[in-house]
Amino acid sequence: MSRKNLIVGQSGGPTAVINSSLYGVVSEGMRHPEAIEHVYGMINGIEGFLNGTVLDFAEALPGEKLDGLKVTPGAYLGSCRYKLPESLEDPVYPRLFKKFEEMNIGWFFYIGGNDSMDTVSKLSRYAAQTGSDIRILGEPKTIDNDLIHTDHTPGFGSAARYVASTVREIIIDANVYEKKSVTIIEIMGRHAGWLTAASALARKYTGDNPLLIYLPETAFDQEEFLKAVENSFEKNCNVIVCVSEGIHDDKGTFICEYDNSVGTDTFGHKMLAGCGKYLENLVRNRLGVKARSVELNVSQRCSASMMSAADQQEAIKAGEFGVQAALNGETGKMISFIRKETADGTYTMDCGLEDVNAICNEEKTVPLEWITEDGSDVTEAFINYARPLIQGTVQIPCGEDGLPSFVYRK
């Protein structure tokens, strides 16, 4: 049987472990020289591939250099937010598959979130429609943890660890003074509040900060919020509040829209930012106390220093499992995570396969039963779900300059 080539790309927002998934795909692909001749990478995703920018991993990261991917955050191959046309009759599809044929591609992998799975769905459906034998699979990635049909996603554990650790540090900082203060921490999450919920992991004891946590899964009432803040002063003069960027009122209006005009990205999603600043001003003006807001921003997704070992290992495993599945003939699937617990309650995880067509353009939100009735906190069920995902510290090698030795694409 003649050998074919494997190609992999990354898309959407990067994470601390998207390169670990890439490592899993590339390293496993290289373990099968009897079937796979070259392992290629698309520079800047499907958009870069259309422009002809591709690298060969055997040349770009030979030998042990490939290991550097496991500790490098961001997206080594670069990313894009290119949306394939809805109609499979669009000329871009035959153009893509002609390029696949010219490069003798037999396996296509795309690492990303919801919109990336949409790309995998369209390509796999076009392949089936035209009789192409290319195996097309999606590798999950998102700090938002909002992909359905999987227990969780690579990237979430490390981002959750960063959020919990940073919130704990902010708590320590706020406790320096005895004067009343409110610190509002704005955390990523448009429609799904998984990352903001992870701030609850920062607590050391019952009644510890953050005293209030608000997710987009429930409606946010500004008057009730102010009452909750006032009541929280009975527990601590320094109140920490964690909010998702996508919190909204009962009419669906984003809280940030009360103060800001909001643009949209290339997929039509509103670009949210500013609810923390709005609430800071609301608290200061209405309650007359010192208030400040902190937006964690991109550091939530790119912090290698807070990389979870569990997250890293699972990301690698997902990449390896995907290649094995593709070699066994699977296509049109996304690798999923299946949670298992041993008799003594120890957390373990297995990989599975899910139909990508049932996943793309859907969102998994935090279950309402994991949110308190008043919508200002999460329950112990969430803590039990999330805590295993942030375990373990990854040792990041440093160079002579004292800084992390990440791999860079030249």
Over which residues does each language-model region extend?
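C-terminal non-catalytic interaction/assembly regions of soluble proteins
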Residues: C256-K410
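Short glycine/serine/threonine-rich phosphate/pyrophosphate-binding segments
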Residues: T15-V25, F49-L50, P85, D90-P94, ...
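N-terminal phosphate-binding or glycine-rich loops at protein starts, especially the Walker A/P-loop
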Residues: M1-V54
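Glycine-rich oxoanion-binding loops at beta->alpha junctions
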Residues: G52-G106, D115, P154-F156, R168
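Glycine-rich beta-alpha junction loops
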Residues: N44-E47, K141-N145, I187-A192, P216-Q222, ...
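Accessory alpha-helical/coil subdomains and C-terminal extensions
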Residues: K99, W107-G112, D118-D133, T153-R292
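Short beta-strand segments
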Residues: G9-Q10, G41-I43, L69, G78, ...
